[in-house]
Amino acid sequence: MINTPRVSIQVQSVYVESQSCPDQRRFVFAYTITIRNLGRERVQLINRYWLITNSDSHQTEVQGEGVVGEQPIIQPGTEYRYTSGAILETPLGTMEGHYEMIDHNGEPFRVAIPVFRLAIPTLIN
């Protein structure tokens, strides 16, 4: 877990075997992110940035507004949770990135998203 003075990020990822097709180099992963507002004032998630790296060292950058179609406002002491997905051409990879957020005064700040692994279960001992 990574903490800033105001926000913490927790990530869990799973392999989605039912949507994957290893013979066609299609490995589907879902990840759930929990964003907790540890501060005393509301914050809002404005943009996201991801760096996705597969085990062939191929990197893809993804950026855009909000997450899953929302730019959530997170009140003090509460959390926002969402699930999204990534498709890799290899059975192993990583994701990392950051959220661009604003505080209650409209001041921007960045929250790092820790590196997390995307891996089919048989690869992890």
Curated annotation (Swiss-Prot):
Matching HAMAP family: ApaG (MF_00791)
InterPro entries (UniProt xref): ApaG_domain, ApaG_sf, Uncharacterised_ApaG
GO BP: any one term: error-free translesion synthesis
Gene name of the encoded protein: apaG
Residue ranges annotated for the ApaG domain, each copy included: 1-125
Taxonomic source organism: Photorhabdus laumondii subsp. laumondii (strain DSM 15139 / CIP 105565 / TT01)
Name this protein carries in UniProt: Protein ApaG
Xref: Pfam families: DUF525
NCBIfam families hit by this protein: PRK05461.1 (NF003967)
SUPFAM superfamilies with a match to the protein in the record: ApaG-like
